[in-house]
């Protein structure tokens, strides 16, 4: 503790002192609440809602609302909030992190701010670390909320959309971070707004906040799917375009860096693939593959734009001539080049949507958290989430004795000493909880105890219900429990009869974790609510932490002392050396998380733009103005690309290319000629093209009707946006992986990622406009309402290695080609003897 803290108290001390008058006010309202009948107490909720609707703030209502909740808890649950718990509740309401020691009743504390914030009617989310705790807390605390006239719901794996929607529409919703995050992503993939399940993210309390916002922050949530692209279609499209003839079947626009089918080429495609209208929106996928195959074969040049290296396609940087490691062409072009060059076409599971917890939780209007251990990570909470940490005083003084670490030369010596200590302690009847850093080490220690005939239970974080049951008995006389550090977290260990007389629960740590916070959590399992207890860590110089980060000075001391295998040293210098090693690791991990957030923030801004655009489409906003703006942008950009800053000698050729390019997208063939337009200015040409396009679009709308046209616009925009966004996610991922491999002289990799990622995003937005306009002008207008379809089906939702497979198989839109059917490439051979040969 620094001199300032000694004189003025710590930050937490000062904050608690500032909050104390509010606690006094809540206390003073107690007698008044006790006089109310059950019905009168419940009516208070409706009174608060009415006052809130009339403009009174939640802060103003806090003392009275907390007093109501406290009295209801006493009646329904038989538990009255202590003053310290009221302090914790106020801190949580203020959108901060409350550090409360194990056994101080965090679950009960949360009821106070949850009740108060539920009055706003915008939904309160309570996040727990597993489904078991979410269900337990909902059923347990739900009694209190329902008594007060509020509804509760729980989100667990396996619910239907309707069940999820009902749970989210409740005043208070419990669930895990994974479930809430995945539902957010799925809501931004729906094709009808009625399919959404979540409401806007309002107020959230994260239990075990350090575990969720720090330990799990590095691994993103990913929803994956088979996508609509299969590698065989790239090969078939490649085979088809290789037979085409330049000028007759396709033309090359060098300025636009593109190749397009002529009318004859379109007819060839319709014949080869057995379709009536190549330009129909239902053939979007086929058009995409053929367009990219044309570009790969006739625009992209080997050893200029790319090289074939180790049977892979490597992009050549057009400015430096160097290979751009890790970078792939976007929009399926890379796969098209792979098909062209006969190397393996990379088949990847498509990322349909992804987000990190860091960015998901920062979307809440107000975020709060509670845990037994947060102070060591206070800097990270403040820098990344804007949350400060307030340490809440314990109801009773902590009586647990934390003994100095014992350091052994070898792991064998350490484990022998641990087994000996467990046996000696067991003779007294004192319960022992042994914390390990991995399942493997738990099982190793268990095998040593079995050899000695010592009865014990092993707990690994696999079965949450069973976990809670075993942990709840870990404090009974004579019980020995071995657990990985995180196992059973969230369940209190209550001491059995006669345990205090033998010294309370003894904690043995088998090695120091790389984070001091995890060590503190293990210690905190003992000494709850002022109980007696003991804790000690056993360490060897062969432990991972000591081996990788331990100081050479400590190793030298041990060597100088000439310790035997079973001998240990115990000193303040040793403990300080270990803490310094932990601080090194913590600092390193924080830097990694901050760097990843720097990358993800780029993607996050792009995600917000796309999701907002999708939402506007779904909400039924009039899209007519947006479509007209897209038409203007596509024409204006095309005119600028072809006719801006060119030599007079090239003007007529470029004008001809421009007309062909826009005829392919929206203008009627033969409507404009070079002869007619060559004397016009660029502005006049642009105006004529726009007027013509608008007239055609107006005629199309008059034919089909405005309502039908708006739905066609919705269907096509959703389909194009989703297709392009999924490809863009992949492209950004490849960019992130490759950017670290490239040498940027005096350039920050994150800055480079921001710049390139921004350029890629702008390109994607431009491609969305071009494709949307193309499909709208070529769509085959029918009397029946167009059907919205998902671009890709979800096949899995994963956070790190935790994959939740969805049983439904992805539905592919394209008709399946039988092995004995004619090959759709148009060769006249059977599929199995042609393009089907290489398809696995």
From Swiss-Prot:
SMART domains: SecA_DEAD (SM00957), SecA_PP_bind (SM00958)
Superkingdom to which the source organism belongs: Bacteria
GO MF, one example: metal ion binding
GO biological process: intracellular protein transmembrane transport; protein import; protein targeting; protein transport by the Sec complex
Residues that coordinate or bind Zn(2+): 823, 825, 834-835
Membrane-topology descriptor: Peripheral membrane protein
Cofactor: binding comment: May bind 1 zinc ion per subunit.
Keywords: ATP-binding, Cell membrane, Cytoplasm, Membrane, Metal-binding, Nucleotide-binding, Protein transport, Translocase, Translocation, Transport, Zinc
EC number: 7.4.2.8
One Gene Ontology cellular component annotation held by this UniProt entry: cell envelope Sec protein transport complex
Annotated CDD domains: DEXDc_SecA, SF2_C_secA
Keyword Zinc assigned: yes
Subcellular localization, as worded in the UniProt entry: Cell membrane; Cytoplasm
Cofactor(s) demanded: Zn(2+)
Compositional bias annotation for Basic and acidic residues: 802-819
Residues covered by region (Disordered): 787-821
Residues reported in the UniProt entry to bind ATP: 85, 103-107, 492
Catalytic reactions on record: ATP + H2O + cellular proteinSide 1 = ADP + phosphate + cellular proteinSide 2
HAMAP family for this protein: SecA (MF_01382)
Physiological role: Part of the Sec protein translocase complex. Interacts with the SecYEG preprotein conducting channel. Has a central role in coupling the hydrolysis of ATP to the transfer of proteins into and across the cell membrane, serving as an ATP-driven molecular motor driving the stepwise translocation of polypeptide chains across the membrane.
Similarity section: Belongs to the SecA family.
Quaternary structure and interacting proteins, as annotated: Monomer and homodimer. Part of the essential Sec protein translocation apparatus which comprises SecA, SecYEG and auxiliary proteins SecDF. Other proteins may also be involved.
Name of the protein: Protein translocase subunit SecA
Gene that encodes the chain: secA
């Amino acid at each position: 503790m620094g001199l300032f803290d000694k004189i003025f108290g710590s930050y937490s001390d000062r904050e608690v002192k500032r909050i104390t008058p509010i606690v006094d006010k809540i206390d003073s309202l107690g007698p008044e609440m006790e006089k109310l009948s059950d019905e009168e107490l419940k009516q208070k909720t409706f009174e608060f809602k009415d006052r809130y609707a009339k403009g009174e703030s939640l802060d103003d209502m806090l003392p009275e609302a907390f007093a109501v909740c406290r009295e209801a808890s006493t009646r329904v649950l038989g538990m009255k909030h202590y003053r310290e718990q009221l302090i914790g509740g106020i801190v949580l309401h203020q959108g901060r992190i409350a550090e409360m020691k194990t056994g101080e009743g965090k679950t009960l504390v949360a009821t106070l701010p949850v009740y108060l914030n539920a009055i706003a009617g915008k939904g309160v989310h309570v996040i727990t670390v597993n489904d078991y705790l979410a269900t337990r807390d909902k059923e347990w605390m739900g009694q209190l909320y329902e008594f007060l006239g509020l509804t509760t719901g729980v989100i667990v794996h396996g619910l239907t959309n309707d069940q999820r929607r009902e749970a989210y529409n409740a005043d208070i919703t419990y669930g895990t971070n994974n479930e809430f995050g995945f539902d957010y992503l799925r809501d931004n993939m729906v094709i009808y707004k009625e399919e959404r399940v979540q409401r806007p993210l309002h107020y959230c309390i994260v239990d075990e906040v350090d575990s969720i916002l720090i330990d799990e922050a590095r691994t993103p949530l990913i929803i994956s799917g088979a996508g609509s692209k299969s590698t065989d279609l790239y090969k078939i499209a490649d085979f088809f375009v290789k037979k085409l003839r330049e000028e007759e079947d396709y033309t090359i626009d060098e300025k636009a860096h593109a190749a397009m089918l002529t009318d004859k080429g379109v007819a060839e495609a319709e014949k080869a693939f057995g379709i009536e209208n190549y330009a129909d929106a239902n053939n979007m996928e086929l058009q995409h593959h053929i367009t990219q195959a044309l570009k790969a074969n006739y625009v992209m040049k080997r050893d200029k734009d790319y090289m074939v290296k180790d049977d892979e396609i490597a992009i050549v940087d057009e400015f430096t001539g160097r290979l751009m490691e890790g970078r792939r062409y976007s929009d399926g072009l890379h796969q098209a080049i792979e098909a062209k060059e006969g190397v393996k076409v990379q088949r990847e599971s498509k990322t349909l949507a992804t987000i990190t917890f860091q960015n998901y939780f920062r979307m809440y209007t107000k975020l709060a958290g509670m845990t037994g251990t947060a102070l060591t990570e206070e800097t990270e909470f403040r820098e990344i989430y804007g949350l400060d940490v307030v340490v809440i005083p314990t109801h009773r003084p902590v009586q647990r004795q934390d003994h100095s670490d014992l350091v052994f030369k070898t792991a064998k010596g350490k484990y022998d000493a641990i087994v000996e200590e467990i046996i000696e302690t067991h003779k007294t009847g004192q319960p022992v909880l042994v914390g390990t850093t991995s399942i493997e080490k738990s099982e190793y220690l268990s095998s040593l105890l079995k050899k000695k005939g010592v009865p014990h239970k092993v707990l690994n974080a696999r079965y949450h219900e069973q976990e809670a049951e075993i942990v709840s008995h870990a404090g009974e006389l004579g019980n020995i429990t071995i657990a990985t550090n995180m196992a059973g977290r969230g369940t209190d260990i209550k001491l059995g009869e006669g345990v205090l007389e033998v010294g309370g629960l003894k904690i043995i740590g088998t090695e120091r974790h790389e984070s001091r916070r995890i060590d503190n959590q293990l210690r905190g399992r003992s000494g709850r609510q002022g109980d007696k207890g003991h804790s000690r860590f056993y360490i060897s110089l062969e432990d991972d932490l000591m081996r990788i980060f331990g100081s050479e000075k400590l190793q030298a001391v041990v060597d100088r002392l000439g310790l035997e295998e079973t001998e240990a040293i115990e000193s303040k210098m040793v403990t300080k050396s270990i803490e310094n090693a932990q601080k090194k690791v913590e600092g390193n991990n924080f830097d990694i998380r901050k760097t990843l957030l720097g990358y993800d923030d780029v993607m996050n801004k792009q995600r917000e733009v796309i999701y907002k655009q999708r939402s506007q489409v779904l909400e039924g906003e009039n899209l007519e103005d947006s479509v007209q703006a897209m038409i203007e942008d596509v024409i204006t950009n095309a005119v600028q690309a072809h006719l801006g800053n060119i030599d007079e000698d090239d003007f007529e050729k470029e004008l001809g290319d421009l007309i062909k390019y826009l005829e392919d997208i929206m203008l009627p063939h033969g409507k404009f000629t070079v002869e007619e337009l060559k004397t016009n200015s660029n502005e006049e040409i642009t105006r004529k093209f726009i007027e013509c396009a608008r007239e055609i679009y107006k005629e199309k709308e008059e034919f089909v009707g405005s309502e039908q046209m708006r739905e066609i616009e919705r269907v096509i925009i959703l389909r194009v946006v989703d297709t392009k966004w999924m490809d863009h996610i992949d492209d950004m991922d490849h960019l992130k992986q490759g950017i670290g491999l490239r040498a940027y002289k005096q350039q920050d990799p994150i800055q480079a990622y921001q710049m390139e990622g921004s350029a890629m995003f702008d390109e994607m937005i431009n491609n969305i406009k071009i494709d949307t306009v193309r499909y709208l002008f070529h769509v085959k207008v029918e009397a029946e309402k167009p059907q919205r379809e998902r671009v890709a089906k979800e096949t899995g939702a994963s956070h790190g290695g935790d994959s939740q497979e969805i049983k439904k198989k992805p539905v592919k839109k394209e008709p399946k080609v039988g092995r004995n059917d004619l090959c759709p490439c148009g060769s006249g051979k059977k599929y199995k003897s042609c393009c089907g040969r290489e398809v696995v």
